[in-house]
Each structure stands twice: as structure tokens, then as C-alpha cells.
């Protein structure tokens, strides 16, 4: 991104900045930056705004610890609005809500918001499990699985897959949820064992579902 393209005169010295979660794509907040705030944000890789009420620079999370870690930045086509993709720590809104945009008008929107929050949590869980790959096996079940190798992990995936299927045949929804949870956990460990992550699986799903009615195995059914 070429920050020299920003038309500071057009925005009266304050650039509107949209903050978006890089993983879930949920819009988290809107703030404003002057040139000093933008320079500080780029240098420190943590979002810093210019507070119009306090008339000073304000790093998001400087009090709460809920920083917005910068991952990507992009100007819009008119060079007068900035989009920042972030990896947020904790809630973004001062009310404790995950996003400042949480006052939806319909139950469907509220459900969508919760889905975003759940997905964000899963991404954090995957990162946590990935970090356990090289941890001390004596203190971590995940590390123990990695220490035992691919065959052991694959065996666990197979076992949990069968148990999930049996629970479904028995029409036991609570057991399906329990076994599917174990299956997803062990499958995540297996992906990390193979130096893969869930985003690669999701990308393949997106590739296979480009057309309406596209079958997961690649054929149209």
C-alpha cells in the first residue's frame, strides 16, 4: 500500500478506517487516523487511532489489553478510506461485545453474529493446538499424540469417525455432538501433523462448490 496516495486534504486530516477481522471478515469498528496515527500503526503493527474527543493518539487496547494486531491494509479506490484486516485480542467494543456493530434488528442477524464469534474462537483453538505440536508431551495430550506419530493420530481419527457414525445410526444427537467434537479435535491434530491447516480444507471446499449443486467429491449431483 502506498500511503502517499492518501488525500489528506480531502479527508480534512482524518482518514476513516474500517477494522475487519482477517479470519472471519466481520467488521469490528470504525475509527479515524491522522498521519501520525497511521505512521505509528504501520511501525508497531497495532492499530492506533486519533481520538476526536480526547484530541490525542489512542492505541486500541492500551488500557484493556484488547489490541488489534495489524495483518493487512488497503486503501479504497478513491484513496480516502482505509481498510485494516486485524487479528484481534479479545472483544473490540468497549461494551464487551466482540464487534462495535452488534445492535442488529433481527434474530437472524444476531445468530449470524454468534456464528462469527464461534468461528473466530475455532481459529484461535486451531492456533493453540498447532503450538502444542512441539510442546512437552508430559504436559500436553496433543503433544503426546504428535510424539507418537502419524499412525497413532490417524488411528484416533478413524476411531472417532466410527464412533460418530455409530452415534448417528443410534439417533443420539447428544452423543453425535460429543463424538463429532472428538473427531474434529483429532482431525485438527492430524492436519497439523501433515503441516496442513483448516483454511486449506476450506479452500478446497470452496473450489469444489463454485457451481450450484456441485457435489463435495467433485461431480455435479
From Swiss-Prot:
This is Histidine biosynthesis bifunctional protein HisIE. It catalyses: 1-(5-phospho-beta-D-ribosyl)-ATP + H2O = 1-(5-phospho-beta-D-ribosyl)-5'-AMP + diphosphate + H(+); 1-(5-phospho-beta-D-ribosyl)-5'-AMP + H2O = 1-(5-phospho-beta-D-ribosyl)-5-[(5-phospho-beta-D-ribosylamino)methylideneamino]imidazole-4-carboxamide. In the N-terminal section; belongs to the PRA-CH family. In the C-terminal section; belongs to the PRA-PH family. It holds the Pfam family PRA-CH. It is found in: Cytoplasm. Pathway: Amino-acid biosynthesis; L-histidine biosynthesis; L-histidine from 5-phospho-alpha-D-ribose 1-diphosphate: step 2/9; Amino-acid biosynthesis; L-histidine biosynthesis; L-histidine from 5-phospho-alpha-D-ribose 1-diphosphate: step 3/9. Residues 1-121 are annotated as: Phosphoribosyl-AMP cyclohydrolase. GO terms for cellular component: cytoplasm. Residues 122-221 are annotated as: Phosphoribosyl-ATP pyrophosphohydrolase. It comes from the Bacteria. Keywords: Amino-acid biosynthesis, ATP-binding, Cytoplasm, Histidine biosynthesis, Hydrolase, Multifunctional enzyme, Nucleotide-binding. GO terms for molecular function: ATP binding; phosphoribosyl-AMP cyclohydrolase activity; phosphoribosyl-ATP diphosphatase activity. Its EC number is 3.5.4.19, 3.6.1.31. It is an enzyme of class 3 (hydrolase). The keyword ATP-binding applies. Its main location: cytoplasm. SUPFAM superfamilies: all-alpha NTP pyrophosphatases, HisI-like. One of its GO terms (biological process) is L-histidine biosynthetic process. Signal peptide: none annotated.
Amino acid at each position: 500500500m502506498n500511503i502517499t496516495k492518501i488525500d489528506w486534504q480531502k479527508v480534512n486530516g482524518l482518514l476513516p478506517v474500517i477494522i475487519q477481522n482477517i479470519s472471519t471478515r466481520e467488521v469490528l469498528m470504525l475509527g479515524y487516523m491522522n498521519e501520525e496515527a497511521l505512521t505509528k500503526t504501520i511501525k508497531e503493527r497495532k492499530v492506533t487511532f486519533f481520538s476526536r474527543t480526547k484530541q490525542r493518539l489512542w492505541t486500541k487496547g492500551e488500557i484493556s489489553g484488547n489490541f488489534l494486531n495489524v495483518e493487512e491494509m488497503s486503501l479504497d479506490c478513491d484513496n480516502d478510506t482505509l481498510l485494516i484486516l486485524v487479528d484481534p485480542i479479545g472483544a473490540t467494543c468497549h461494551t464487551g461485545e466482540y464487534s462495535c456493530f452488534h445492535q442488529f434488528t433481527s434474530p437472524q442477524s444476531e445468530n449470524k453474529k454468534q456464528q462469527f464469534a464461534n468461528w473466530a474462537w475455532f481459529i484461535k483453538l486451531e492456533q493453540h493446538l498447532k503450538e502444542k505440536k512441539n510442546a512437552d508431551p508430559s504436559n500436553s495430550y496433543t503433544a503426546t499424540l504428535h510424539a507418537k506419530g502419524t499412525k497413532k493420530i490417524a488411528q484416533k481419527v478413524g476411531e472417532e469417525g466410527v464412533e460418530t457414525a455409530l452415534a448417528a445410526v443410534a439417533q443420539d444427537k447428544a452423543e453425535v455432538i460429543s463424538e463429532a467434537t472428538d473427531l474434529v479435535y483429532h482431525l485438527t491434530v492430524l492436519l497439523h501433523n501433515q503441516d496442513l491447516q483448516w483454511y486449506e480444507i476450506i479452500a478446497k471446499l470452496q473450489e469444489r462448490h463454485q457451481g450450484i449443486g456441485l457435489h463435495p467429491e467433485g461431480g455435479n449431483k
